[in-house]
């Protein structure tokens, strides 16, 4: 019984990570947008932006899920303007978020 319960809990813990899994093409698209726009703040931590590769900064955001991260990316937060100040479509914006998340997993 305990073994089944542990397996069920582990499965639930993996759901957010699995929902963010992407293919190489999406990650390349995300990296391109990151390098053209997001890098300014997410490479330095300017205005409290979570730095690329900083697992500790990204973990609470990842725990909230992709929908929450996309809401922030789309609408902006703090000094970050909506869509990171770009005209990126939802697919490209999501690819950039997924790229940044992939750098800490």
Features from the language model and the residues they span:
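N-terminal export/targeting leaders of redox proteins
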Residues: 1-28, 104-105
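Local sequence-structure signature of Cys/Sec-based thiol-disulfide redox active-site neighborhoods
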Residues: 28-36
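ATP/adenylate-binding site constellation spanning eukaryotic-like Ser/Thr protein kinases
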Residues: 11, 35, 66
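Axial heme c-ligation environment in periplasmic c-type cytochrome domains
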Residues: 50-51, 69-103
